Amino acid sequence: MRTVVIAGGTRGIGGALAARLRAAGDRVIALGSADADLTSVRETAELVGGRLPDRIDALVLAAGRFDMRRVVTAEGLEQTFAIGVVSRYLLAERLRPALAAAARPVVLNLSGTGGIKAGRIHWDDPQLTRGYTMFKATMQGARANDLLGVAFAARESRVRYILYNPLLVNSGMHRQFRQPMRTLVGAAATVAGATVDGAAKPLVTLLDNPPDAPLTALRRGKRVSLSRQEFDTATATRFEALLKGVIAAV
């Protein structure tokens, strides 16, 4: 029996994936907001330190939070950055020993996976204290997670890291928008988007048979070349250093 930890595993794609894995007989630890405050560096560290098993076969990073307003956590971090970037980094890095104890360990990060021209790292203001928009925060997070995958895979490890963008999914995210965008995005998701269960199905296959490469990027199942500038190793190293500074300051 595999042990799978899913951050963001109580609703949306993560919840649908959790249901599929449980039905297949896997032990699933689904982390939602009631289980741990993943916007908090301290709570995330405590979660890793004492509440998760010593062997984890798969770690799925699907937690995220979006808000039209800039929300600051109790630790002074912008909320989207805290849960969508910082917590994912902490979980993957600090669970390395538990993952290494498994036979075929894999990290699956639902991320941007390159090609998002609007996504960029705001090096001088990663907390977006100036000119915050939900779109800007979300796109920075997508870009950041691609870099986290590069940084993780750069260190020799048996753990396979998969970056996966399911593209348009009818997950209800459109409810975060103001009108008329809420109606437009909701209609597009209903017509063209995959259901959360449909989006979860290929993820099961990836967890069952992870690629052999240390890092793989996929956009709705189609491979994305890691030679793209979005996966630049030097940029990933620079971003990880920035992130360590943010965490150390908390």
Residue spans of the language-model regions?
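Rossmann-fold scaffold of SDR-type NAD(P)-dependent oxidoreductases
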Residues: 7, 55-64, 108-111, 162
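N-terminal Rossmann NAD(P)H-binding glycine-rich loop of SDR-like oxidoreductase domains
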Residues: 7-20
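Rossmann-fold cofactor-recognition segment
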Residues: 29-44
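Conserved amphipathic alpha-helix within the SDR
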Residues: 42-55
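Amphipathic alpha-helical dimer-interface segment in Rossmann-like NAD(P)H-dependent oxidoreductases
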Residues: 49, 83-103, 150, 154
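Short alpha-helical oligomerization interface
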Residues: 68-83
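Catalytic loop of short-chain dehydrogenase/reductase
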Residues: 68-69, 100, 104-158, 165-181
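C-terminal helical subdomain
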Residues: 144, 157-163, 183-249
